[in-house]
Amino acid sequence: QISDLDDNTQKSAFHVLANIPKRLISQSIILQPKLPIVPPASPKVLKNLREAGILAMPIAQNTNAIYVNASYAGQNFDDKKIMLLEPIAEQLVWLNLARTKVTDNGIASLTKYGLLTRLHLENTVITDKSSIHLSKLSNLEYLNLYGTRISDESLPNLQKLGKLNKLFLWQTKVTPQGAESLKKYFVDSQIYNALIAQKKD
């Protein structure tokens, strides 16, 4: 519960909840994400994460699946702190590492989190070396690589993510030609068209 969080983490959680668009709230029943059935995480582990300034909370009511947001920790969250997430590998489904200090070495450890469906890595220093590890996250549906050093070299690995339906490549080193080559790997043409439009901006 949010009331169990420390003051700073509570503020972050309330900010997230307060800024959910009303339209999304009204459609929440229709748009309930499909979540895996997993055992509950240890309250002690969740407390340790909160004390480290990492927001960790259930994705929805009546589920043990967890959303972790480390972006509030910013540059204070590095590769070593990814190890703090290991005790919740069975529950971690959504992970936000945007604007943190994680590197390719840290991304290598994410292969332990096979249930991940959403992963934010925008504005981190990761490079093409990370893509081979990302390709092993077979349940990924959403991947944000905005503002990273990812290039066309990563595309063969990203193409292996068969469940991926949203991929953000703004301000990366991926070329328009590289983005174009992704077309046949994405069934949803609207997502593909959005990707190409983003690359042209």
Q: Which residue stretches match the model-derived regions?
A:
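N-terminal capping/linker segments that flank leucine-rich repeat
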Residues: 1-117, 123, 129-133, 153, ...
